[in-house]
Amino acid sequence: MQPLTGLKVLDFSHVIAGPLATFYLAQLGAQVTKVEKPGGGDVLRGNAMGAAQFTALNAGKDCIAIDLKSPEGRAQALELARHCDVLLDNFRPGALERAGLGWQDVRAINPKVIYCSVSGYGTLHAPWKPRGAYDHVIQAATGMAMLGGEAGGPPLKVGFPVVDVMTGVLAAFAVTAAVQERQRTGEGRLVDVSMWGAALQLMYTQSVNVLATGAVPERVGNKGFSGSPAAEYFAAAPDAQGKPGHIAIGANTVEQIAKLYGVLGWSPEQAEAELERGHGFARAKNPVQFRERLALALQARSAQDWEERLQAAGVPAARLRDLGEFMQEAQAVGAFVPTLLQQGGVQVATPGLGWTCQPAGQAVKVK
């Protein structure tokens, strides 16, 4: 499935957010030309992961070096912009304008261009426009780092560049939507994608609640979104090798908690007595006592044992794994097959696109 075949994308992005956006476009069939600075290129080429990480984010693209500080380089880039369908960058706002490649410059020679600017704070709001940003900086600025962890504790950032990734996904989504609209209107479009906007999308439900009530979200640690007393991470007994474990349980409703009680050997009717109805998600009449009793009971078996028993009973549950452990297990059961990507002479195994589409048994192909 290559729905973007024939789409020409000029890519002035680097690091994660922008390259991920154009990676998705390339994997969906677009012809992506990635412009890098001479003498080093994208900073990811020289980081600890080296060529493998760069390949994972840039497979399927044609990479060229252009010096945007030279008149010849700017002229070459402008000529490429004249013939592209989409131009995307994630430099600090103003960088391409200084090179004569801003939205108005490109629009003047290519009225139908979809011009996507990806930045920390957006390009349309003067007070914030010049600000630089990285993933962890945006997590701090938007309050994301104050959603994790426990009340009264230090800030806790998400352990991977979640904002960068979401920004890339949103940029690819926005560009695809703008391309579709252009087919109807024949007009180009300036698409402005900010990292703070992506952060609010990740915190969508919490953001809506703040707008509706003005209340600052509570820090919930490892508790589930539902607020159910049985939706949390709990310590379990050590496994056969003596390794301690944790079990994540998602018993959000009274009915699910009744099933949990059955697995524990408790009377399901007891759940009715200890829980309050009428809240949507389950609420305990005495939350502290409820959790203490449940936590104590879950220490009787290993996390693996609880996972199997609870899932069999219809209660969402999973033992705590690290990423490598999960990927090995997913491959072992045939649920996950790594996708091999190649860029130049480097081949790297990746998780693919995160989805499959198989009309008539034909899987999506990746470059």
Where in this protein do the model-derived segments appear?
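N-terminal helix-loop segment corresponding to the beta1-alpha1 unit
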Residues: 1-184, 341
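Short Gly/Pro-enriched turn/cap motifs at secondary-structure boundaries
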Residues: 54, 218-226, 232, 249, ...
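Conserved Rossmann-fold dehydrogenase catalytic segment
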Residues: 123-124, 152-160, 183-199, 219-224, ...
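Flexible glycine/proline-enriched surface loops and loop-helix/loop-strand junctions
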Residues: 153-163, 238-245, 360-363
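Oxidoreductase and adenylate-handling cofactor-binding alpha/beta cores
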Residues: 168-188, 202-212, 261-272
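Aromatic-enriched alpha-helical interface/lid elements that frame and gate functional surfaces
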Residues: 230-313, 317
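Conserved PLP cofactor-binding pocket of PLP-dependent enzymes
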Residues: 311-334
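Flexible, small-/acidic-enriched active-site or ligand-binding loops
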Residues: 340-367
